[in-house]
Structure formats: structure tokens, C-alpha cells
């Protein structure tokens, strides 16, 4: 996925973005060590959602916005509640029916720092 993201950025003249693909728990810890503070963090965890360590690292990175892509409404609700307690509010929720004629739905949530 990151290869397509990078190509899309080049095609659109975007030079101030870095794309990192990998396990969020590992990547967030590495970014913290490098003292990286992204403007936007995009997470697309497995069905089990984000673990506590990953949420801790994500919040410590202090992004202005978090885009959370989820295939499980229950873990999405759980993680959004935790992120809300940690200073992020839900701005937009968009369900995406990627699998018509099934009960499965992807949901994209935009969260922003609460001021």
C-alpha cells in the first residue's frame, strides 16, 4: 500500500509527507524514539483493534488528527472511547460498504485534538 501512496504523492506534487507501513505497535514506538510528531496519523488495525501500548504511543506522538479505519464496530467504539478520554474527539464517521450483499462494513473515523 505504501508504494501506491508514495506514487500518488509524487503525482500530486506532495513533498512534505512520509508514508510508513507496518505494525502500528512497532512503528509508533520507532517514531517516538525518533521524536517524530506527525500532523496526521492513519491507523487501520486488525479486527482486534489497537492495543493499549499502541494507543499510548499514538497519543504521545500528539498528532493533530487521527484517521482510524476499522472493520469491527465494537473495537472501533472501544478505541474511540479511549482516544476520547486521551484528548481526541470524533469529527466525522463514514461507513464504507466495500463488501456489498454482506454484513461487513469498513468505517473511517476522523478524530481531532480537543482544544
Regions found by a protein language model. Name each.
Residues 4-115:
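Rossmann-like S-adenosyl-L-methionine
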